[in-house]
Amino acid sequence: MIIADINSIARAHGGRTIFSDLSWTIQDGEKIGLVGPNGIGKSTLLRTLAGLESPDAGAVVLRRGARVAYLPQEYAGEPRRAVLDELLAARDDLHTLEQRIAAAEARMGEPAVAADMAALERVLAEHERLLEQFAALGGPALHGRAESLLRDMGLPEEQWQQPMEVLSGGQRKLVGLARCLLADPDLLLLDEPDNHLDMERKTLLEQIIRAFDGAVVIISHDRYLLDETVGLIAEIEPAREQGARLLLWEGNYSAYVTQKELALLKQQQDYIAQQKEISQLEAAIARFKLWASIVVNERHIKQARNKQRQIDRMDKIERPVLERRRIALQFHPQQRGGAKAIDLRGVDKAFGDNIILLDARATIMNGERVGIVGANGAGKSVLLRMILGQLAPDPSSYRGRAEDAIWIGPSIQLGFYAQQHETLDMRKTPIEALRDVRPMYEGEAVAKLGRFLIPYAAAQQPIARLSGGEKSRVQLARLMLTGANCLLLDEPTNNLDIASAEVLEGALDEFAGTVVVVSHDRYFLDRVVDRIFEVRDGELYVYEGGYSYYAEQRARQLRPAEPTPARPPGDVKGKKPAPTTRTNGQ
């Protein structure tokens, strides 16, 4: 059954056509991933579906009585409203009914109504009708459902009466998702729902999407999430004449990538064959016209016209874009570096009573790729910044020799990518940002920025005015110019579209140095890292292998009972490291 019908809609902004004549039908129960490059119009289409924006032409028709819930990229809610009240506000219809029920009950106690049997019967009948309506809409269970959803989202009861403004970005996102679910929608629209979520919450999000009875449309750069939840990919891609067009692909994201590649190769073959046929027809037309001019033969003129009509009647095949323009990213270390890159020798770190790490020990060899994972607030970025030297280990570290607790190889040059773009001076232009790293002429800086898809106009603006994706690309361009042989990356795929994330994966795969990366992007971690460091409850656990192997090991551990942390590989002479170890000192 159709839940939403998009009929030939068009949208333009600032003189730029976003899409025109776009049509799409969404069926009940479909789980759809909406993909496409940044800036193509995905969020605009989602807001149009939600009724928050109106198309310039065409219409969006929803099934009669269908309810739609929309979760934006950044969900703030009412800053001063209590968390539980923020959820309950999703059902304004029930709140209105509660007010009407209360008003009817108040009228029953009025002397004039109590003295008039007919009036009292009318009020009682209205009260009964309102109660039935309230029950039919799930009113009596509303508070219980809201509380249950908050528990499912991992929000403790002591936070339910706190104002929204005190929550973290990830917690606000979960409240927004819970509010959407409480609204009992038939169509759920999610714009980057995994932003700010840690691994555990991403797994919860997957379970919620899979269990949801209605239709779901998700915008996400998380390929793992799209693989696990959707059965249809809706791709918005640039079109030559109409802004953007929508293509539908059956299956999850990985299936879409394979189908897309095969379809482009087939289109290329068909295009070449058609161009060959057109060339042959055009050559024949030229011959017939030449003969007609020599012998003045009407038959040759007719043959030329017939050949031209053949060409005109053809459904022209567009020349496929086999490789869309992508950022040009390559990391070339200036020097190779020694055998050992980083050594953690019993690192302690706490903020007040909150213990981040206690006697953390691990060795990272040159050329290794290490992924740091853990719940939000566990201390992943803290560990990265201690390695970088921006934070100092506590004085108790390394038996009181805190200054030696983190050893960096003498030939190791660190390069840092900051999650919040702190490496960038927001007052400077991208051109200045590149020239700060390496002396170069302005034209060379503009050319390098162009290879990172930063247009000339944006290259001359203060970085503060750039989009999140543009800031990320400027940061990557700067990092590339450093020539560092050990890259410390804090959530590098945030704000990158899938194409740019794939380029980053390829660049890191070819990089000859060491990589230490904090990320919640499971697909990215599986492609890039060969060891996992998990920060959990003040401990540092080491897992040999990529993210999928780590997730499998953790699942096994959690099924029976939590294992006792083991000693680090280096503490037991001659022993091979266990797949899962706690890097705890003796």
Write out the residue ranges for each language-model feature.
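Intracellular alpha-helical coupling/juxtamembrane segments of multi-pass membrane proteins
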Residues: 260-288, 297-300, 304-314, 318
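Short acidic/polar alpha-helix capping motifs at helix-coil junctions
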Residues: 291-294, 468
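Hydrophobic stripe of amphipathic alpha-helices that form coiled-coil interfaces
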Residues: 104, 111, 137, 144, ...
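ABC ATP-binding cassette signature C-motif
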Residues: 1-272, 325-326, 330-586
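Short N-terminal helix-initiation segments at or just after the protein's N-terminus
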Residues: 9, 254, 286-292
